[in-house]
Amino acid sequence: MESIRVATWNIHKGVNGIGPRGRLEIHNIGLAIDQFDADIICLQEVRKAHSKHAARFERWPDQEQADFLAPLGYTPIYQTNAITKHGEHGNALLTRWPVLSQRHEDMSDHRFEQRGLLHVEMVIH
């Protein structure tokens, strides 16, 4: 039986810390993901966009974080869980295999903590 390598990581929107002490970590996260050699990588708290962080951090990627973090040859799938004043964030899946379908299900129990489930169907070979 062949094995499948799966990794999961809450990347905390690519920033370590909050406020003026926050540090941009998205580039380090990308380097770590490249080292995983996982077939499927599930990511939580992934930014699609954030205008304040883009203005504050000189090296903020021009791409959405899921696209930026996807190793060469991987397909990034992203769905938004929360839309805020300055941007949005959600869940992402990076996969080596072809994606058949994807959907998002809102799992929020109230409007102040938006949660979502990313469901992806793929062909594994």
Regions found by a protein language model. Name each.
Residues 1-71, 83-88:
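N-terminal, active-site-proximal structural segment of metallo-dependent hydrolase catalytic domains
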Residues 8, 91-93, 117-121:
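Conserved hydrophobic/aromatic beta-strand scaffold that supports enzyme active sites
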Residues 12-14, 75, 100:
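Active-site/binding-pocket entry motifs
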Residues 71-73, 86-102, 123:
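Conserved beta strand-loop-helix elements of the APE1-like EEP
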Residues 79-84, 108-109:
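Short, solvent-exposed loop/turn elements at beta->coil junctions and helix N-caps
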Residues 97-125:
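Active-site catalytic loop in hydrolytic enzyme cores
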